[in-house]
């Protein structure tokens, strides 16, 4: 059996560890999340630190708590949005796929690496995530309108109407037909986002009582994981205000072919789609 002599406090290895720990304890990172800055001091964010065999070992419990605090204050993923409609009503709309949040593991990796290397500042843009088609989050680049921004699509089920806004200016206001209420195929309410656009496109799916379908459309902009989106509906004859009740779509927002080009051209990937 080999006996290892315990290290003395005066050994070079112990001195190196002490120096490394002292250097790290004095470091701090200016962490920017959107328009806010957080000074994250290593001696406050790291509950304990060890330096063994040339590597740091961190207890990041305090940093995790700080991440949660920032998410509570700023993140929009899964939150309920306060929204003022085009008709002047203030309503609450639950967040669905739209939004962003800080991912604990990514933030911890970024901050601890910055502590190790002495990097003084970081932007959280690389540490966020989202859900749905775009897993890196949506809406991080704006704090306007409660995080919804000033470029968005608004859909009123009761009014069977769509409004589009671009940089705060209304660029479209049209009547539409949404999902069939009588069969439970209502267009899903909540705050979504434009996942992608395609022109032309072939839509495939099924609807209650009609079986499966495959239909070509000239313009398609999807906003839910389940396959709902905006599209032209050349086959539709009934555009009445109450058509959606018993003659609605399978969940999509049907737009008149003559009006769909303007809708398509004024929708952008990642923008919020607010449906109520």
Residue ranges and their predicted role:
Residues 64-65, 79-80, 189, 205-276:
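Exported/periplasmic cell-wall-interacting domains
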Residues 1-215, 267-268, 274-276:
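Surface-exposed, secretory/extracytoplasmic low-complexity segments enriched in Ser/Thr/Asn/Gly/Pro
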């Amino acid at each position: 059996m080999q006996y290892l002599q315990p290290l003395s406090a005066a050994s070079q290895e112990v001195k190196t560890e002490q120096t490394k720990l002292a250097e790290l304890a004095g470091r701090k990172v200016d962490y920017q999340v959107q328009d806010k800055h957080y000074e994250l001091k290593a001696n406050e964010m790291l509950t304990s630190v060890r330096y063994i065999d040339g590597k740091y070992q961190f207890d990041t419990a305090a940093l995790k708590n700080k991440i949660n605090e920032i998410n509570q204050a700023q993140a929009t993923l899964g939150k309920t949005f306060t929204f003022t409609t085009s008709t002047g009503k203030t309503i609450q709309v639950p967040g669905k796929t739209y939004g962003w949040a800080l991912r604990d593991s990514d933030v911890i990796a970024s901050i601890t690496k910055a502590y190790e290397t002495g990097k003084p500042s970081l932007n959280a843009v690389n540490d966020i995530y989202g859900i749905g088609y775009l897993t890196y989050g949506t809406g991080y680049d704006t704090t306007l309108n409660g995080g919804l921004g000033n470029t968005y699509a608004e859909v009123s089920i009761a009014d069977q109407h769509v409004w589009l806004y671009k940089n705060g200016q209304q660029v479209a206001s049209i009547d539409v037909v949404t999902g069939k209420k009588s069969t439970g195929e209502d267009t899903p309410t909540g705050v979504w986002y434009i996942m992608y656009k395609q022109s032309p496109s072939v839509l495939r799916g099924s609807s209650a009582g009609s079986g499966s379908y495959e239909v070509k459309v000239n313009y398609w902009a999807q906003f839910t994981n389940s396959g709902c989106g905006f599209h032209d509906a050349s086959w539709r004859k009934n555009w009445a205000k109450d058509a959606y009740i018993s003659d609605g779509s399978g969940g999509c927002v049907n737009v008149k072919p003559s009006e769909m080009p303007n809708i398509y051209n004024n929708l952008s990937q990642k923008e919020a789609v607010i449906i109520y």
